[in-house]
Amino acid sequence: MGRWGHCLFGHDDAIGHAIKVSKDVAQGDDRQFAHMMSRVIVGCPPGVFGFYVEEYSLAEKIGPGEMEASMDQLIRHKLDSGLGDELFEKYRAAEQHGFDFDDMSKYLVIIFAAVLMGYGAKIKESQIQHLRDLVPKLQCNEGVVPPFGDSGFRGPGKRQFLAALDHYQAGKRRSFTQPSCHGCGKVNGDIKAEGKTLMKCGGCKNERATAWFCDKDCQKGLWKHHKHNCGAPLGRGIALFRSFGKNSFGVIAYDGANV
């Protein structure tokens, strides 16, 4: 479907899964749902961001800024008190036993794990191993794919997720909207001890799809793929909302489809 960035949440299918997860975690609490959704859509194109803000009346439900930390703690406590394990098993059962068109059930488990890491919630070692086993089973493309065949990961998003698993620590939040190396998936916190800082690709002119690299080796290693995405935004992209919102169908066009 529509993809405006290379990383995990730069894709309308990922947003759709995150909506389901947010509803399941919030359990009918509108403020918790709005808080979770605001984190997920922060890097979306304006049209996509605006669609969800209006569709779910997010601006009316989000509390003042000082409430964010306490809301994070509340959600993590819910997840750590059994809800995280319960939902993991629920989604995993659907992945194993249901009809899995475009690996959607598998992708849901990945997005749920990203949400868990986003709140620093507990993930069991057996669950982490299942996630590692699941990643290679999902479609992964390094470059532009026609929208209706564009499911699963982009390469940088896959590496971003695997790096997050490698550096996972219970109680420590991991943002999937911060820059990450497109070559190895690491974020600044992962490479700080090595004296490195992420560098933005000088050739990228597409703000939401700009590539970042932790060193020249990662940049050179990915160049055969990245050169096709580097440069100015090309054409128009389309995000298809299907049944993710309250409406049955929605379409938003945005600048730059060379991702």
What are these regions (language model features)?
Residues 1-259:
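Short alpha-helical interaction motifs and adjacent low-complexity tails used for partner binding
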